[in-house]
């Protein structure tokens, strides 16, 4: 009998800007254009170098959606020498590759052409679907229109980009909405074969936001959503939970087979009140299962060659490194 495997990625989390065109009712990440709203290139490079020294394999670039739509942002970025946020993330992706880190970008809504450009320097990319429902929390967030998000996930499939998506629980959606969201994701994967993993993420209320007093999903509700995801999604799509946002050890038996990216250096800037578990805690969460490190591009996509030629030497080198005999998971 094969031992169950739970995977994770060792990453660096780089929030390139907190400026965002959306105003979601549950978000504490967004800020206006102001001093310090852009991660300085020197800080980004220091973070990449320190993370590589700690054995990380992934550089997770996250930033607010369409920050250039917010007045004053592009002028501020221009003073750093970049025309727009995509120029900046492209430059830092190259810097990550040079330091033996595989880039994964989560940028919010991107056009087909923008996805195609970033595909050259990213091993994988992501966009949370969140929900197919029209919920009040997204009333002031044009980028959270479900049709717009589905179109981007589909475009990523057309471009054969290994992709992460997911659902967000507790933002005003119903159980039927969750099922519909998962079926949409499953259908996109059956058509394009590009969804690596689906995150089942629970909403965490933030002080000072419109939803600070909203009810949160309990463990049974989260577990039921995980089980539903495992039932609906194709077998080759991983079901992931963020191990810092819920009682992961209680949920692991519901169908979870991935614990996402965790960092030995950087915090979760979207949920800063929830620290990442470190390796010993991940082992405890995995229980009797084998805890196995992975890259941000899953093995089946490496085998299929679904990556830019620029990334091939690094992908091969890192895949060999994490598979080396005697290497402890995450060492």
UniProtKB/Swiss-Prot annotation:
Belongs to the radical SAM superfamily. CofG family. This is 7,8-didemethyl-8-hydroxy-5-deazariboflavin synthase. It catalyses: 5-amino-5-(4-hydroxybenzyl)-6-(D-ribitylimino)-5,6-dihydrouracil + S-adenosyl-L-methionine = 7,8-didemethyl-8-hydroxy-5-deazariboflavin + 5'-deoxyadenosine + L-methionine + NH4(+) + H(+). Its EC number is 4.3.1.32. Catalyzes the radical-mediated synthesis of 7,8-didemethyl-8-hydroxy-5-deazariboflavin from 5-amino-5-(4-hydroxybenzyl)-6-(D-ribitylimino)-5,6-dihydrouracil. The keyword Lyase applies. Residues 6-244 form the Radical SAM core domain. Binds 1 [4Fe-4S] cluster. The cluster is coordinated with 3 cysteines and an exchangeable S-adenosyl-L-methionine. It comes from Methanoculleus marisnigri (strain ATCC 35101 / DSM 1498 / JR1). It is an enzyme of class 4 (lyase). PROSITE patterns: RADICAL_SAM. Keywords: 4Fe-4S, Iron, Iron-sulfur, Lyase, Metal-binding, S-adenosyl-L-methionine. [4Fe-4S] cluster binds at residues 20, 24, 27.
């Amino acid at each position: 009998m094969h031992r169950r495997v739970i995977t994770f990625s060792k990453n660096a989390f780089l929030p390139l800007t907190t400026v965002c065109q959306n105003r979601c009712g549950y978000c504490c990440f967004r800020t206006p254009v102001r001093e310090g709203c852009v991660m300085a290139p020197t800080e980004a490079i220091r973070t990449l170098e320190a993370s590589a020294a700690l054995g990380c394999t992934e550089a997770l670039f996250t930033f607010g959606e369409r920050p250039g739509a917010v007045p004053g942002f592009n002028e501020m970025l221009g003073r750093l020498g970049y025309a727009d946020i995509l120029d900046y993330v492209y430059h830092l992706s190259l810097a990550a590759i040079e330091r033996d880190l595989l880039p994964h970008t989560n940028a919010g809504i991107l056009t087909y052409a923008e996805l195609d450009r970033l595909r050259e320097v990213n091993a994988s990319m992501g966009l949370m679907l969140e929900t197919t429902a029209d919920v009040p929390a997204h009333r002031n967030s044009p980028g959270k229109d479900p049709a717009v998000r589905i179109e981007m996930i589909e475009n990523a499939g057309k471009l054969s980009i290994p992709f992460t998506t997911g659902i967000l629980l507790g933002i005003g959606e119903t159980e039927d909405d969750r099922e519909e969201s998962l079926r949409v994701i499953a259908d996109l994967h059956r058509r394009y074969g590009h969804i690596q993993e689906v995150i089942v993420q629970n909403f965490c209320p933030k002080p000072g936001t419109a939803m600070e007093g909203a009810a949160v999903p309990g463990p049974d509700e989260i577990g039921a959503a995980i089980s539903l995801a495992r039932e609906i999604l194709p077998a080759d799509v991983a079901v992931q939970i963020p191990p810092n946002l819920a009682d992961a050890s209680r949920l692991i038996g519901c169908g979870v087979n991935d614990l996402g990216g965790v960092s030995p250096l950087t915090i979760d800037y979207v949920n800063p009140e929830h620290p990442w578990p470190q390796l010993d805690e991940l082992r405890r969460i995995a229980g009797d299962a084998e805890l196995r490190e992975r890259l941000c591009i899953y093995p089946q996509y490496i085998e299929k060659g679904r990556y830019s030629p620029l990334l091939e030497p690094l992908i091969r080198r890192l895949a060999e490194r994490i598979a080396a005999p005697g290497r402890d998971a995450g060492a």
